[in-house]
Structure formats: C-alpha cells, structure tokens
Amino acid sequence: MIIMPYYDSGDLIKYIKNGFYYASWQEKLKNLKNIIIGLDNIHDVNIIHRDFHSGNIFFGKEGMYFVEEITIGDLGVSKSATESSYNENYGIIPYMAPEIFQGREYTKASDIYSFGMIMWELMTGRRPFWNRNHDIELIIEICDGLRPPIVTNAPNGYIELMEECWHFDPEKRPSATEIFYRVNKICEEESKNCDNKNPTEIIKSSDIGPVTTNNPNAIYRSRNLSGMIHSAMSLWSSRSQSINLEQFNYYQKNNMGPTGKRKYENDLIENKEDNGMI
C-alpha cells in the first residue's frame, strides 16, 4: 500500500479548468517544467509510469497560477523498465501510445507520448479527444496516425516539441531529460518576451478553452482495455490487409491511414484575426 498526502489544490485537470485563461504562458511553462522534472526523476530510477495523464499530476502549494509543488502520483501500475509486462493493459485511450495498442511493451517513450498529450491539454484547455467516443474506432485511428488538432496558441518551439513527443515511432521521441532542457529554453524565451512586454497571448477562440461537457462516451478514468485493444487490432489488421496498391497510394497522397480516415497530424487550427486577446 502506498500512502500519499492530500493535495488540496487538486490535479492538473482542476488547474486548467479554473485557470486556463488567467495563467500566463510563462506560468504554464514553469509548471510544465516541474512536471517533466518529476517524470525524468521516475525514468532516472528506471521506472515506467504506464498510466501518465493529467489526473495523476497533483498540485500542492500554489501561488497565483504557478504551483511550487507538483507530484506525479498513481504509480500502481508502474514497473521497472527491465521488467517484461505482456499482461493486461490499463489506461485512458487518448493518453496511450499507439505501440501499446499494437501489442508492444511499455517503454519510457510510451510515457513521453502521454506527456505530449498533456502538453496539448495545457495548450488548448481541453482533454485530448474530449468530443469523441473512446472506443475501438478511436484506437484504430490513433494507430493510423490520428492526433488532436493543433492550434497556434503556443510559444515558439512548443508545438514542434509536442509533435515529437507523440511521434508514431517511439525511437524518435525525445527523452524526459531532453524535454526538460527544451522546455526550459522555451520558458527562458518567454520570460524575455514578458520582460519586453511582448508575452505570448492566450487567444480567445472557440477552438480552445475548457468545455463544460465532454462526450458522454469519452472515458477519462483508467480501466482494463485489453479486450477492446484486442478487438481493435483484429479489425485494424483486417482493414489494412484489404486495401490494394492503388488505394494505398491514394491514402498516402491524401495523408490517410489504412482505414481511409484522414489524419490530423499536419492540420493547424489557425487563430482567426477577429479573435480577441485575453
């Protein structure tokens, strides 16, 4: 049994819900830096979290919108990186790396994929795939390359790092240590912007900001997904094998996966000129 202190400031979900439009990018980046420090510490002792999401990031002592104490919790399914783990898969679909759906083992890079989703959440104020059913079809589309739509509401370098974190190939994702240095650099640049009275603005847009209601079938609690994953991969495999060369070339040209679903990897939701600034 693991006994943890009570964090009266809540978790990252509560922080985003209550402070998205009030916390500056400088404050958000400082908090993000503390989150990646925590993950890096976990990885340094050769542990893989395996269920990393915004509900497992707890806030302690809090200033206005910068949190001095951030703890990564819920290590109940964590394992040593040297321990084989071909067993049941627990988690939340949007935060799970595609290689896990495909039957490969968890690695530190799987946690990094989850961190990329947390970056998206901090950027948009919404949980990934909040408007989708968390079902077999979503698993298949994630394996086809589907990622949440990107908005340009972020400091320079942020989106590029986020996309690297959720790269389909685990080998191409940065380590937690590398992410720390890059987030720190982005944070330093944003501090300079603030000193020059030119901070990155939080833009008011219908595409960002907390939503009052998620899709009722968007399930943001960890659950046993082994059966659903098995069914999804059986269907994904049969669909992939059924396409011919002409269809494959068409899908590649139009940035689509084997199921014929369009990927979102390169789609940008631009902030419109008539949007107001916070």
For each predicted feature, which ranges?
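Activation segment of protein kinase catalytic domains, centered on the conserved DFG
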Residues: 18-33
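Catalytic-loop of the protein kinase fold
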Residues: 43-60
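Conserved catalytic-loop aspartate of Hanks-type protein kinases
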Residues: 111
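A conserved short helix/loop substructure at the end of the activation segment
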Residues: 166-178
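Conserved short submotifs of the Hanks-type protein kinase catalytic core
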Residues: 1-11
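Conserved activation segment of eukaryotic-like protein kinases, specifically the C-terminal portion
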Residues: 86-100
